[in-house]
Each structure stands twice: as C-alpha cells, then as structure tokens.
C-alpha cells in the first residue's frame, strides 16, 4: 500500500511516550481554519517545524503519521475540482441566505457537516492554506514575471476520524533528544 506522510507539531511537555501512545491530538483552537479535527501538514516536515516555531513558541515535538496515498474519504479542497466547485456553489448560496454574515471556510464546512451526509462520506478535509506561510519557498517561472511555483505548498489535513490514519503509525521524529534508543 502506498502511503502519504503527514506531520503534526504538538507542544513539548517532556512526555514522549504519552505523545506517541495518544496522538494525534485534536486542535482545540476556536479559530481552526477547517473546523474541529486533528490537524496535520501534508508531506513536508518543514511546515510542521514552521508551525512549531510560530504557534508553539519553539517548544514542540513533531510526529509523523500516514494516510493511504490515494486519499480515500477525503474532502479535497486542494486537488479535487468537483469538491472545489461544489464548495464554491455552496458558499455563494450561503452568502445569499445569510447576507449580513461573513461566510468563512469553517462556516461552510460546519453547514456541510450539519445539513448533509458529509461526516458519513468523509473522514478528512484537505486544503491549501494560501498565504499562511510568508517564507514559502518559491521558484519563478520567468525572471520578470510574478508567477511562481511553491516548492513546499502549505497543505493541511483536518482529520475528522482517526481511522483515516494508518493504525499504529504515529511516531516522534523531532526533537532528536526523543530519538535516542530506549527513550521512546
């Protein structure tokens, strides 16, 4: 089975055994971009390091988990044109239904969860967080053109159901102090 690596940064409380046994950990922030769930970065560990520095005050642990590479049961707002188009149509309809409300990504997702079979069909949401990381590595297509390719695109997974992740595959990979034999 082909696997896709996913990375989660969590606060380092000097509890590596507990982290590996109980992870991943649910995001408890009220401003979570994709709603309630377990947030992991897609494929690039650099994103988890950035999040650890930015959000956890440089006191963090990074764990690696895996999903099936083909991303079954994923509501993909990055790479599935049908999902993206349906999401846009729904957001436009909600804007008309609630003309005085700011229609945000989490609001649309919560409406989907509350008023459809979304949670029966999908176990994760995948989206690219545009402009969240100001230092995203880029490579220009042409010298005097603004167009560029992001070489570490900031793509997040919000896992709604832990069974989406490959069982038993949640392991600390940073910091090195927890990688010493016998510690974890």
Predicted regions and their residues:
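Short, charge- and proline-biased low-complexity linear segments
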Residues: 17-25, 49-71
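Extended catalytic/binding region for NAD+/ADP-ribose chemistry, centered on the ART fold
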Residues: 28-55
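Active-site and NAD+-binding cores of ADP-ribose-processing enzymes
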Residues: 8-9, 20, 62-184
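Short, surface-exposed beta-edge/turn micro-motifs
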Residues: 2-4, 35-38, 59-60
